[in-house]
From Swiss-Prot:
Post-translational events: This is a cyclic peptide.
Keywords, alphabetical: Cytolysis, Disulfide bond, Knottin, Plant defense
Short name of one Pfam family: Cyclotide
Official protein name in the record: Cyclotide mech-3
Superkingdom: Eukaryota
Length: 29
């Protein structure tokens, strides 16, 4: 989805569960 996860992603991975990387920001699905 659109809400951000409050983190940036490195190497295309996000630490927060159910979040995906749209560099440089992680978004909830």
């Amino acid at each position: 989805g659109l809400p951000t996860c409050g983190e940036t992603c490195t190497l295309g991975k996000c630490n927060t569960p159910k979040c995906t990387c749209n560099w440089p920001i992680c978004y909830k699905n």
